[in-house]
């Protein structure tokens, strides 16, 4: 029954995402999860078929969510990234996040995010896949330039400003990579073994600030394992910490190709598999629904609802 509840939750979140994004198409103001938006999502959810729900929790065409054309919900267009739009044609290259963090200027981070948000709107991008806030632990990590250093306080302040700037333009920001993605080498197999105190003092602060202060719309999980469990299927990390302790209401998506198993990801709390539903496959989910082993219809609805209102 627990796995059932997770899928229901993910469907609702995805629906909330879609409805909220539809509103943002006509306004640059940051939208929030209002009662009206929730009601719209619930109405759509009640009319969706099982196939529509199962398909909606996986992306399509590399950088898009699925449209729900009969409900007027467009596909959501995503783009990397932290330092400018890295997809959908030539674009402006912004200074890297490390340079931005070196200014210690949160207002500048907000202006940076606002400019990036305007760039997104000009290109029809609904969701930008940034900021990235991995804490520096491995100096040889090839993506350190994308991040904001090793100081959890500085990273929290700069990421919060960045997110407020982006979302102030009616574009969804995505904080990544949750969590402890300290090296890109062999990242699909590395386990970052970290005690709870270190997580709370070093790794969590920037993500917690993004959720509680900036109300970030999306969180992207990482490729690695945390203490022997993949972050895309880690109930303590995704449900207990992110959802319950911090009160995150947005979408939790996988990094591209970082979903490793279907049912553990569903039970763990993952909402959206990107770039496609290759592990959380509709046919496999249908099988478990039919057999009644660990899934039922409730489990499919919440990710869809959240995507609609976001």
What is each stretch, according to the model?
Residues 1-32:
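Bacterial Sec-dependent N-terminal signal peptides
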